[in-house]
């Protein structure tokens, strides 16, 4: 059994960070690949929410989704929030899996305590359980930003999902930040450096 872990919302200017973990075996993973599972960034919202529902209701899958709010990110820092969320998933899921695979290139120093952790760059494209975790995290993030968009329509959160797009930054300059913005994420560099904006828009 493999425990796959991924996140959504790491680079956002607004809203929460979501980290998800999914445990299942090879047979179930294959079932989802046949349903069209892939990295959540390559799925449309309709397919993503469809797969989210299938993951959550599948009898052979265990999953966890941990939310860290903008306020927690401001108070603790993004790195600490990521580590705490991953650790919470590991505490819940490690006894069910003989392999732990995390998307990216860091185990946040947790590989000393959990020696069977493997970090995999672009893991959401290579490991089904990481792709499933990616789908859950992104679906939770999308849903949150759609709900917040109903309160603050000017920021375009239903489209940009909290990332620093041109429209989002222009709205922040004009209207200021909301209580759901990460105030520790300075906008100064993004406004002065259009290249950063281009990179962030490609991440959406």
From Swiss-Prot:
<dbReference type="InterPro" id="IPR022898">
    <property type="entry name" value="RNase_HII"/>
</dbReference>
<dbReference type="InterPro" id="IPR001352">
    <property type="entry name" value="RNase_HII/HIII"/>
</dbReference>
<dbReference type="GO" id="GO:0005737">
    <property type="term" value="C:cytoplasm"/>
</dbReference>
<keyword id="KW-0378">Hydrolase</keyword>
<keyword id="KW-0479">Metal-binding</keyword>
<feature type="binding site">
    <location>
        <position position="6"/>
    </location>
    <ligand>
        <name>a divalent metal cation</name>
    </ligand>
</feature>
<dbReference type="InterPro" id="IPR024567">
    <property type="entry name" value="RNase_HII/HIII_dom"/>
</dbReference>
<protein>
    <recommendedName>
        <fullName>Ribonuclease HII</fullName>
        <ecNumber>3.1.26.4</ecNumber>
    </recommendedName>
</protein>
<dbReference type="GO" id="GO:0030145">
    <property type="term" value="F:manganese ion binding"/>
</dbReference>
<comment type="similarity">
    <text>Belongs to the RNase HII family.</text>
</comment>
<keyword id="KW-0540">Nuclease</keyword>
<keyword id="KW-0464">Manganese</keyword>
<dbReference type="GO" id="GO:0006298">
    <property type="term" value="P:mismatch repair"/>
</dbReference>
<dbReference type="GO" id="GO:0003723">
    <property type="term" value="F:RNA binding"/>
</dbReference>
<feature type="binding site">
    <location>
        <position position="7"/>
    </location>
    <ligand>
        <name>a divalent metal cation</name>
    </ligand>
</feature>
<dbReference type="Pfam" id="PF01351">
    <property type="entry name" value="RNase_HII"/>
</dbReference>
<dbReference type="InterPro" id="IPR012337">
    <property type="entry name" value="RNaseH-like_sf"/>
</dbReference>
<feature type="binding site">
    <location>
        <position position="103"/>
    </location>
    <ligand>
        <name>a divalent metal cation</name>
    </ligand>
</feature>
<dbReference type="GO" id="GO:0032299">
    <property type="term" value="C:ribonuclease H2 complex"/>
</dbReference>
<comment type="function">
    <text>Endonuclease that specifically degrades the RNA of RNA-DNA hybrids.</text>
</comment>
<dbReference type="GO" id="GO:0043137">
    <property type="term" value="P:DNA replication, removal of RNA primer"/>
</dbReference>
<feature type="domain" description="RNase H type-2">
    <location>
        <begin position="1"/>
        <end position="197"/>
    </location>
</feature>
<dbReference type="InterPro" id="IPR036397">
    <property type="entry name" value="RNaseH_sf"/>
</dbReference>
<keyword id="KW-0255">Endonuclease</keyword>
<dbReference type="GO" id="GO:0004523">
    <property type="term" value="F:RNA-DNA hybrid ribonuclease activity"/>
</dbReference>
<keyword id="KW-0963">Cytoplasm</keyword>
